[in-house]
Amino acid sequence: MAVQQKIRIKLKSYDHSLVDKWALRIIDVVKQTDAIIFGPIPLPTKSHVYTVNRSPHVDKKSREQFSFSSHKRLIEIINPTSRTIDMLMKLELPSGVDVEIKS
């Protein structure tokens, strides 16, 4: 039995609509090359909350909280061809989306 090659693409952004839009765009590009694709798989959203004092030195009880969420999507490509990899390398993603590729 032959070993299947696979590529995992993990997209991360603070804007969920941007992640979804680019995940669908990557899927469209990969479908043109006849590779098998799974996804986009939504991964858990992480919320980050930062608490700071409102004043520089008094009123410890007066605080302000800032929060933001990071959204992630996972795309798996099974048996990618060289054409698939070339087309993925030509994609220009916006600066708001972080891409992590593992094989």
Swiss-Prot record:
Gene3D superfamilies: Ribosomal protein S10 domain
SUPFAM superfamilies with a match to the protein in the record: Ribosomal protein S10
Superkingdom in the source lineage: Bacteria
Coiled coil: none
Keywords: Ribonucleoprotein, Ribosomal protein
BP terms from Gene Ontology: translation
A single GO molecular function term of this UniProt record: tRNA binding
PROSITE patterns in the record: RIBOSOMAL_S10
Leader sequence segment: none
GO cellular component: ribonucleoprotein complex; ribosome
InterPro entries: Ribosomal_uS10, Ribosomal_uS10_CS, Ribosomal_uS10_dom, Ribosomal_uS10_dom_sf
Protein family (similarity comment): Belongs to the universal ribosomal protein uS10 family.
UniProt-listed HAMAP family: Ribosomal_uS10 (MF_00508)
Role, per record: Involved in the binding of tRNA to the ribosomes.
NCBIfam families recorded: PRK00596.1, rpsJ_bact
Subunit structure, interactors included: Part of the 30S ribosomal subunit.
Protein's name according to its UniProt entry: Small ribosomal subunit protein uS10
